[in-house]
Amino acid sequence: PLRLVGSEMCIRDSMMDIAARSLKIKRNVITKLLNEGLYPYTKRYLGTFENHFSTIGLIGMNEVGLNANWLRADMSDPRTQEFTKEVLNHMRERLSDYQEQYGDLYNLEATPAESTTYRLAKHDRKRWPGIKTAGKPGDTPYYTNSSHLPVDYTVDIFDALDIQDELQTLY
């Protein structure tokens, strides 16, 4: 299996820790405001946020595959697909740990993140001019959503579904 080692794993886990902690803080603030009457309609219909998930996702796994020295291949390559499965499974395990740590529900979603994919790709291009992003050279850079195939990968939906099938069930 293709595994992250050392600093790459620490960076990924550190980013997840920040996201989980941030979501916990936001949940606490919103719950406090809800209980103090600032969201009366929400309070009436939901009552509480205890049964609601704090969601963590990822973007740009296609570009991770293109930029990773040990892969250099997009999501259509079985090695990149396998690496993506490992990352998603690891994220699921971490989310389970956060549920125990914080006492709230956490989930992994293939989140739509169009504006975020553009913003992060733009910043990354500035910092690392040679980085591979989605789109054509000279176009506005962006990352593909979650673990999606490149936008122009195929016109055959069944081909795309065959590749995405195992990945999408991990969200």
Cite the ranges covered by each PLM segment:
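Acidic, glycine-enriched catalytic cores built around paired aspartates
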Residues: R12-I59, E63-Y171
